[in-house]
């Protein structure tokens, strides 16, 4: 195929997205340069249906030409990639507008500047629909009725006087770059709500998973008491509005990930494996939970991740029995204690990669050896886990995964020799006795799958149970496919013997 034909093909591929097609205006600037190129063009064209249906043709015809690269074409490719990424976020907002067609989805950027954190951490939902990681305090409004999105930016962004330029400024340039209809100063927010105040409009929002009420109930909107403080003021000023919590519905929109998201999750998972193995090696009698946590955090950074995706849990003894670990969020010491011989540790860790979360865990004996009763029960627990993991695939429900887990658990009823194992099997075979047993999604945040599992979703299979003050837990990350599930966290021990060997290294 000739050079001109290849250029025409590239133009056709890119014009599969109207937004990406506009970027072709820069290509004539580099007409005289050799087409040696760069695989980023594949990303720039990913919005094209033709490309999605003819991936191999695109790779063999075009990418073959763009193999070595030259600077001008690299500039062009980066520009095209930026446009394609903006188109991705626009597509996400379109899906949100369709989902919330009867109202307005409001997503608030993080406002907290925490000097004790490793950096600014953006609200995951705001980031998913904008891609803005350093924009503080902004508000995104996705109007389902008009099918338009508004980004309201603070008039005085933080540290502007100190020379820190905001990630994005209000105006037409930002609207073009972000593929957003309106990027304006938040002084216009009042007029935006006033223009909708004559209608009975639902204002959808997402509550934080671990946020506590900031005001007493008698000061909150009676129709939407669970709404955040900033929303309470809006509901008070315009009573026709009704706030509706929509966290699960937003998570469902995020559940099936793009190629780029899956790549980030693979990296998060890989670094999390390294962090967990480091944590296993740090568990010793007399050590503090804090000392293990610090080893895990350091291992995430050493593996190339952006630290931990959540502060590690190295919960020993009673601290590992649910729901006790949750109380660590409200404690200055994070339930820190000294690890005691004979106890089991819930080692639950995750590393963050490009905002995406890893999550992985094992039950670890403080003494570096399970006692005979613990060993028998752990062996049964692992067998049940593996039976549940085998049925993971698109179309399977969480109840079906539990049934497979329970069936294998009960199969060991007659062969179990210890009282601990026999009583555990009897108790755990009833769903009501293992209320924290779960399958959850993992991406920018964690969520609960809605309906059957879908291909392209990253999930964590995480049975959680306890007996006699001992917590048992096992967790891996999986990418759901049509035919099964790909384990994203290989290389971590399962058996008692393998865990003990890892502790001895």
Model features per residue range: what roles?
Residues 40-51:
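Short, Lys/Arg-enriched N-terminal segments with co-localized hydrophobic residues
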Residues 7, 25-26, 39:
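Alpha-helix boundary/capping motif
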Residues 52-54, 58-66, 82-505:
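Active-site neighborhoods and metal-handling regions in enzymes and metal-associated proteins
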Residues 12-15, 59:
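Low-complexity, intrinsically disordered or signal/transmembrane-proximal segments
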Residues 6, 10, 46-47:
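N-terminal amphipathic/hydrophobic targeting modules at extreme N-termini
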């Amino acid at each position: 195929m000739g050079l001109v034909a290849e250029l025409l093909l590239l133009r056709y591929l890119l014009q599969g997205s109207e937004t990406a097609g506009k970027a072709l205006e820069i290509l004539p600037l580099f007409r005289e340069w050799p087409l040696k190129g760069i695989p980023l063009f594949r990303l720039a064209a990913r919005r094209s249906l033709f490309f999605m249906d003819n991936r191999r043709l695109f790779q063999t015809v075009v990418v073959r030409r763009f193999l070595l690269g030259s600077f001008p074409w690299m500039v062009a490719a980066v520009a095209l990639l930026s446009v394609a990424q903006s188109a991705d976020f626009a597509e996400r907002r379109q899906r949100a507008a369709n989902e919330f067609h009867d109202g307005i989805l409001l997503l608030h950027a993080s406002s907290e500047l925490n000097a004790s954190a490793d950096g600014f951490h953006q609200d995951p939902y705001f980031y998913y629909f904008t891609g803005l990681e350093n924009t503080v305090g902004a508000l995104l409004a996705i109007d389902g009725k008009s099918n338009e999105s508004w980004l309201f930016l603070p008039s005085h962004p933080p540290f502007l006087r100190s020379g820190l330029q905001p990630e994005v400024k209000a105006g037409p340039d930002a609207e073009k770059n972000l593929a957003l209809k309106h990027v304006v100063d938040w002084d216009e927010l009042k007029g935006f709500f006033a223009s909708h105040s004559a209608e009975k409009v639902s204002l959808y929002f997402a509550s934080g998973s671990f946020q506590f009420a900031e005001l007493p109930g008698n000061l909150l909107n009676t129709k939407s008491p669970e709404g955040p403080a900033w929303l309470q003021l809006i509901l008070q000023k315009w009573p026709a509005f009704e706030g509706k919590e929509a966290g699960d519905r937003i998570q469902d929109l995020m559940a099936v990930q793009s190629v780029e998201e899956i790549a980030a999750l693979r990296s998060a998972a890989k670094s999390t494996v390294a962090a967990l193995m480091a944590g296993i090696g740090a568990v010793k009698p007399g050590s503090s939970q804090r000392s293990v946590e610090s080893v895990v955090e350091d291992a995430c950074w050493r593996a190339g991740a952006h630290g931990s995706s959540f502060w590690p849990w190295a919960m020993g003894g009673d601290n590992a029995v649910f729901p006790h670990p949750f109380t660590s969020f409200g404690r200055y010491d994070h339930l820190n204690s000294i690890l005691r011989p004979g106890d089991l540790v819930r080692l639950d860790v995750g590393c963050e990669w490009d905002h995406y979360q890893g999550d992985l865990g094992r039950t670890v004996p403080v003494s570096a050896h399970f006692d005979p009763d613990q060993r028998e029960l752990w062996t049964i627990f692992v067998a049940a886990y593996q039976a549940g993991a085998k049925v993971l695939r698109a179309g399977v429900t969480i109840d079906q995964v539990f049934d497979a887990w329970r069936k294998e658990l009960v199969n060991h009823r007659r062969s179990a020799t210890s009282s601990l194992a026999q009583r555990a099997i009897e108790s755990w075979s009833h769903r009501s006795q293992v209320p924290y047993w779960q399958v959850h999604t993992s991406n920018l945040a964690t969520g609960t799958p809605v309906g059957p599992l879908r291909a392209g979703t990253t999930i964590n299979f995480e049975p959680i149970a306890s007996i006699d003050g001992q917590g048992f837990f096992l967790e891996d990350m999986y990418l759901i496919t049509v035919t099964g599930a790909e384990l994203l966290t290989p290389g971590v021990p399962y058996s008692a013997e393998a865990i003990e060997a890892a502790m001895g290294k």
